[in-house]
């Protein structure tokens, strides 16, 4: 009985506290930030494509929970043919981005891969300007410049380490392709996905990602490696999917109750969480140059959001 009373009091607190959306925003950024950390642990010895396919099952579960929460599943029959095409294209781009991202994570340092992936914002803005004729404000221009410079500084390595890693720079290619496909996801959404509730669109795209990921696993005949995955890595692969799902739930709750501009700004700070945990968990070092780059990326992000 005491536990029931405590639960009711806590629930009333969540509903009654007008500033709880800030807490949910912070939680959203936290869980988004640790997703890469959990995934990195989970793909140490596991094929990254297999890991992506497995974690997408968990992510898909959460994405449809979101749809049920907002009640948009009933609008599926109203989606027209053109929108379906762009939803599928967006899903394929998302899938390609995820596959490249986790491959890059497996091969490279988190504090190098994540900034490149986050720089997809730059390409998205440029493509929107060229293809959709969207205006680039001074705030966006400054933000793009700062994020670009910050990314460049963060991926720089000392000369000794650069010489050592000359033979293994494939992670850069995968990280760049991850950013490119992430940008295409946004562009496809802008071009052809009109009138579809955002959570439903995410669920449909994630369904496409799941099919794509498993098709790749079957095509490359990697399905037999699933039974070879250690319990530890399987656990962390699942936890990375759960972290993504919980981040989405917190983000939605924060958007529902709070100021959109502030919620988005806090969520963008997930890169700070990722970098911090990469230092603590993987002992990755953040040089002065990388620290300056990270600072520029954060400032650039706020420039685009606030101006």
Predicted regions and their residues:
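Juxtamembrane helix-loop boundary signature in multi-pass membrane transporters
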Residues: 2-26, 122-180, 287-307
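Hydrophobic core positions of alpha-helical segments in small-molecule transporters
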Residues: 27, 54-55, 89, 116-119, ...
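Residues that define the loop-to-transmembrane-helix transition and helix capping
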Residues: 49-50, 111, 137, 199-200, ...
